[in-house]
């Protein structure tokens, strides 16, 4: 059997822990062959690993012992493995065994001089893997064998931080006794106390406080107290308020933020606790009549119904039994305390909007979502999901015969243009490892823009409103964004392969779309734009495979393209004209009835057909014209 084929069997035996089968497969093989077989990297299930790595990953100590003691396999081999949905590049057998909780394999590897401080591509150590998994026995063994507890990963996230976040109190206690720094800061500015507070691990918060963990702000201006309040971790908030030496303002804002967060949190919704904590905070503000701590309230915001936040116990008492007012009060309080640029402000706004949409209260939903969208764009956050959410709710409204305001569509189109503009800039300056997702998001935004254009064609617009919508379409058309295949907006509008989101959107939008194509053309879309294969929109539409049942769409698009100056004799990179690319007799007939070849087109085709030299003989604009033919 060839070595390539045999390597697969060797890997399978190691992965399944079949030590006798593995030994039999390697019997009578030469040393170079054995070295090759045991160092071959096999790709399987998204992993790239050697027999040693997969055996360690799966906890097969007998296989690991055989490979190390009999075949002297390099204990420092690295591969790519999957753990809890994460892909780990550069992992050793020791990292895998530690992360998977295989204590005997860990001991075996360390006894064969595996490097306990070897780091993966993201600077993760075997000790960090064990802390993630919460295996105190492995953590203790590694530390006793010189594992460095201070090595942080590439985000400066320490072993103590991951153990605190995952809730492994015994590991946290052990690391602190081994002098792990409770005040080390991650790249985002957070400490172990931030992570424990966010996750609501009360015992760990108590332990960290005992070890003098400081109440510092992270990169978003959040203390562990604020993080706990924002995450609805009431017991942690109360513990920190009892132990930390915070001023009156911090104490009051923690109670207000906790109450406000209970009002609009999908997982922790509790309107009773909302009022309870807001009322406690209000009492704190009015505790000393000679020194009332007044709120610095936000100016009224349209999304919140132009409400002003309650400023005294009487105003708060007046909304006790009005849950809708309490929901909005919660959103206003959160935005005041966290600041409009905080990354967490928008999520509850979106949630509350979704609840309104579920209850058919679309106007309130759209106001809230527009506010959240503007906050996220102001903070330069990625908004492709927010934009799609609007296409979905507008489609739902149209499907239910609910009126959609053209002004709302225009505002979302405007935000969509901005997001696509930013997306183009991100693509031109890619930041690894986000390059692929940046391109994915960019294409999603192009599709969403087309959904919004399609929705605009089904929305009642006044004579004053239509030009406002057209202005946003014009802006994007002249940016000329492209897909990875080089398709323009017009290509997508006439392509039956353009994907349509299936949550409400496909009830209203479909492609090819004659109204969308016409509107794009009216706003200046180039009817002779070509993709990477040299195909024009006309090349695309003539391949539509529903020419009978959707004849009107096919006919209208071909007419619109030709009347706007689409060249019916234009060739793609395979030298095929739209007529050559037609896949049905109907599209052929429609094309032939529209073909009005100019003398200029005939001359260009003759030049190309007879290979007459024309480069540098005619004006550059004419050269491009000839090349199209």
Curated annotation (Swiss-Prot):
Protein name from the UniProt record: Protein fem-1 homolog B
GO BP terms: apoptotic process; proteasome-mediated ubiquitin-dependent protein catabolic process; protein ubiquitination; regulation of DNA damage checkpoint; ubiquitin-dependent protein catabolic process via the C-end degron rule pathway
Any one GO MF annotation of this record: ubiquitin-like ligase-substrate adaptor activity
Organism of provenance: Xenopus laevis
GO CC field: Cul2-RING ubiquitin ligase complex; cytoplasm; nucleus; ubiquitin ligase complex
First-listed, main subcellular location of the protein, grouped into a coarse class: cytoplasm
Function: Substrate-recognition component of a Cul2-RING (CRL2) E3 ubiquitin-protein ligase complex of the DesCEND (destruction via C-end degrons) pathway, which recognizes a C-degron located at the extreme C terminus of target proteins, leading to their ubiquitination and degradation. The C-degron recognized by the DesCEND pathway is usually a motif of less than ten residues and can be present in full-length proteins, truncated proteins or proteolytically cleaved forms.
TPR repeat extents: 346-379
InterPro entries in alphabetical order: Ankyrin_rpt, Ankyrin_rpt-contain_sf
Record pathway: Protein modification; protein ubiquitination
SUPFAM superfamilies, sorted: Ankyrin repeat
Assembly, per entry: Component of a CRL2 E3 ubiquitin-protein ligase complex, also named ECS (Elongin BC-CUL2/5-SOCS-box protein) complex.
